[in-house]
Amino acid sequence: EGINDYQHISPEQLETLRSGFSAHQVEISVLGCYQDLSDPDAEKRAAAVQNVCRVLGWQHLAGGHCVGSETSYLHLDAEERAARREWMFDSILRIVEAAAKTDAIFAVEPVYWHPLDSLEVVQQLIDHVADPEHLHFIFDPANVLENHNIPHQAKLWNDWLSLIGSRVDAIHIKDFTYGSTGTDDTYGPCPLGKGCIQYDAISKWLHQQNRD
């Protein structure tokens, strides 16, 4: 019997999930519940928040270290991102308030084509929520590296890690290439070290922090 939706997950299924991973010594770093937290439709946005809050209630039962989401499903332009930002702030505040009630952790993932798109907006979110214990981050360098910043990665990664490093619960490691036109349309995944991401600064930070 599978799991069809968030509304009908049982404690028995959560225990099966936890024990199955534990038996093979596999940690559940992120219990994913990726939702559109900035949907302009208030009803859909409320349902997305409710889904994340429901999964936060299962975090400990499932053995997850945090519950994670991005802030949209869509590839948004700058105007669309700005228009959705207040909805995103409100959604995340409600989610973190729910996390605090069960001592869970919500980890949000910045993406440059989503409303949580930059260091400046992340700082605004941190200030708005003001709960370092229950608001953490998933850091995916590939999702915050815009074409114009490719030559400036050492500073970029140091800036990101200075801001959110103490709250990073997971780092996604991958690589990609841009085509000759340097546009998003020519993005292509590739093996680590074969693309444009320079991991030296991130690797150095990980060793300095003694992070797993």
Language model feature labels by segment:
Residues E1, S29-Y34, V67-E70, A107-V111, ...:
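A cross-family glycoside hydrolase active-site/sugar-binding cleft signature
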Residues E1-R18, S72-L76:
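Glycine-rich, proline-tolerant flexible connector loops at the mouths of alpha/beta enzymes
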Residues G2-N4, L37-D41, H75-E80, L145-H148, ...:
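A short acidic, helix-capping loop that chelates divalent metal ions and anchors anionic groups
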Residues N4, H8, D36-R45, C190-G193:
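The substrate-binding groove and active-site-proximal loops of carbohydrate-active enzymes
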Residues I9-H24, M88-A98, D159-W160, A201-W205:
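Catalytic-core regions built around general acid/base machinery
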Residues L17, A46-G57, I150-L161:
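Short, acidic/polar
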Residues G20-H24, L37-F139:
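Active-site acidic/histidine proton-transfer and metal-coordination neighborhood
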Residues A42, L116-D212:
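Histidine-acidic metal/acid-base catalytic patches
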